[in-house]
């Protein structure tokens, strides 16, 4: 088994010292991943290409996966290598391997040569091509757009016949650019934006603001680990989880409805900037796209950016949602994003699309910033490699009911605004109103001899809150889905 790995062309327009550094990093990245996934596969840096070889094909599939999923590789040539005696011997070997392939088709021969020989690359192409044309009567030479291109490479006394060309990711080798912190939610956008910066050579760490309990966190850990394992596993990166429910509760209690969305995003950026500074990370990356939601207008994005000195990168800023979903499908994150929970949480009824600086600052003056500082202090930090076992877990299920049993109590956990807009009324049933952001502190004060059915509009937040309560030892909770 042998592959000739061609680095991305952008690497070769750089200075000699930078080119050497980039290709050395690429060589190291390939070797690091292959050593973890295979045995007895060697990696050699040959100045303008990298060779990956093994005496057997045992790890062919694993090796090919690594070469097509590692940033910095333009393409990899799968080759059959042999020794040759002279020009005619090259022709004989090419005829043996490619003669049957060109029968009844048009073809051309393309050759590359390294080392000292008594023939040029063009002479090699003409000799082999002419010989094939005479030996295979049904084949015809066609130099432009042929059915088959027979590719050969000669290096000193070795002949490499190209079996197949495998497209790589492109971009720069991982670690050639500075580290980034992805504010990942597990949806389509944040997964794609993280991938784009991995591809461009940055080690991407992941910061997750948890608004929905353990089920959401498990899902986001899974997609983060997937991105790292498939495209960036040559690097050690961190996964940081921050329980943002106290921040949401503070916003819902103190901030005017129309400003909630922008204020929440400003809190995300403040927190992200503080985490980035703690770990010496230069920039944040988000999946925001211009105009996709009310907080993503130019005016609102400017106000969001102003709360931190950390650079904020938005690689999807001018992308259509359809294009984002298409790329997520291609890179394998679509299935994660499709099942990622959505929330009944901080949704302004009339969100501002053009926030005013003075108004935002006045609303944030009501916010207790000690809450934000505390959740950052309590952030859970882990090596993403430790997620592997957890990534196999599935969020536990909680029982859902359509009818209310006798003596059961329905807990409406929607925000006060949602409750006012669409009151829940059920004849003969006791209904209590406890917003989800107060449930963890107030549920223990209820009569625990009763059964409680949690309700919200979509049934997602109620399920997540029920799971959380069960984790705390309360087993008298179910989800009400009429």
Curated annotation (Swiss-Prot):
Signal peptide: none annotated. It comes from Vibrio atlanticus (strain LGP32) (Vibrio splendidus (strain Mel32)). It is found in: Cytoplasm. Keywords: ATP-binding, Cytoplasm, Disulfide bond, Nucleotide-binding, Redox-active center, RNA-binding, Thiamine biosynthesis, Transferase, tRNA-binding. GO terms for cellular component: cytosol. One of its GO terms (biological process) is thiazole biosynthetic process. It holds the Pfam family Rhodanese. Disulfide bonds join 344-456. ATP binds at residues 183-184, 265, 287, 296. This is tRNA sulfurtransferase. Catalyzes the ATP-dependent transfer of a sulfur to tRNA to produce 4-thiouridine in position 8 of tRNAs, which functions as a near-UV photosensor. Also catalyzes the transfer of sulfur to the sulfur carrier protein ThiS, forming ThiS-thiocarboxylate. This is a step in the synthesis of thiazole, in the thiamine biosynthesis pathway. The sulfur is donated as persulfide by IscS. GO terms for molecular function: ATP binding; CCA tRNA nucleotidyltransferase activity; tRNA binding; tRNA-uracil-4 sulfurtransferase activity. Its main location: cytoplasm. Pathway: Cofactor biosynthesis; thiamine diphosphate biosynthesis.
């Amino acid at each position: 088994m042998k592959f000739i790995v061609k680095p991305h062309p952008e690497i070769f327009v750089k200075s000699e010292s930078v080119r050497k550094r980039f290709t050395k990093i690429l060589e190291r990245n390939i070797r690091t991943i292959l050593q973890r996934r295979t045995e007895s596969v060697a990696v050699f840096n040959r100045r303008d290409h990298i060779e990956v070889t093994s005496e057997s094909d045992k790890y062919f599939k694993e090796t090919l996966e690594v070469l097509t999923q590692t940033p910095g590789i333009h393409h990899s040539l799968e080759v059959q290598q042999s020794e040759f005696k002279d020009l005619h011997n090259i022709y004989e070997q090419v005829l043996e391997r490619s003669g049957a392939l060109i029968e009844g088709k048009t073809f051309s021969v393309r050759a590359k040569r390294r080392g000292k020989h008594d023939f040029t690359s063009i002479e090699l192409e003409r000799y082999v091509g002419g010989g094939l044309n005479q030996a295979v009567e049904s084949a015809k030479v066609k130099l432009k757009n042929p059915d088959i291109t027979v590719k050969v490479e000669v290096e000193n006394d070795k002949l490499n016949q190209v079996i197949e060309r495998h497209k790589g990711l492109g971009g720069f080798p991982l670690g050639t650019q500075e580290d980034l912190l992805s504010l990942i939610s597990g949806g389509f956008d944040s997964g794609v934006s993280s991938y784009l910066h991995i591809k461009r050579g940055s080690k991407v760490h992941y910061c997750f603001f948890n608004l929905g309990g353990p089920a959401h966190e498990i899902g986001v850990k899974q997609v983060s680990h997937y991105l790292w394992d498939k495209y960036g596993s040559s690097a050690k990166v961190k996964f940081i989880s921050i329980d943002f429910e106290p921040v949401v509760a503070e916003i819902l209690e103190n901030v005017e409805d129309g400003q909630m969305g922008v204020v929440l995003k400003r809190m995300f950026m403040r927190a992200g900037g503080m985490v980035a500074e703690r770990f010496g990370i230069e920039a944040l990356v988000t999946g925001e796209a211009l105009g996709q939601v009310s907080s993503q207008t130019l005016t609102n994005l400017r106000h969001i950016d102003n709360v931190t000195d950390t650079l904020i990168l938005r690689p999807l800023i001018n992308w259509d949602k359809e294009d984002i979903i298409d790329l997520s499908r291609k890179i394998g994150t679509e299935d994660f994003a499709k099942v990622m929970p959505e929330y009944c949480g901080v949704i302004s009824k009339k969100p501002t699309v053009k926030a005013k600086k003075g108004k935002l600052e006045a609303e944030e003056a009501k916010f207790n910033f000690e809450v934000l500082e505390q959740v950052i202090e309590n952030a859970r930090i882990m090596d993403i490699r430790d997620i592997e076992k957890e990534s196999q877990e599935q969020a536990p299920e909680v029982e859902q009911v359509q009818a209310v049993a006798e003596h059961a109590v329905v807990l409406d956990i929607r925000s006060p605004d949602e409750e006012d807009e669409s009151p829940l009324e059920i004849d003969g049933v006791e209904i209590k109103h406890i917003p989800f952001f107060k449930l963890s502190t107030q549920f223990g004060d209820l009569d625990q001899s009763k059964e409680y059915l949690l309700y919200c509009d979509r049934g997602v937040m109620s399920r997540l809150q029920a799971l959380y309560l069960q984790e705390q030892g309360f087993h008298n909770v179910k989800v009400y889905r009429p």
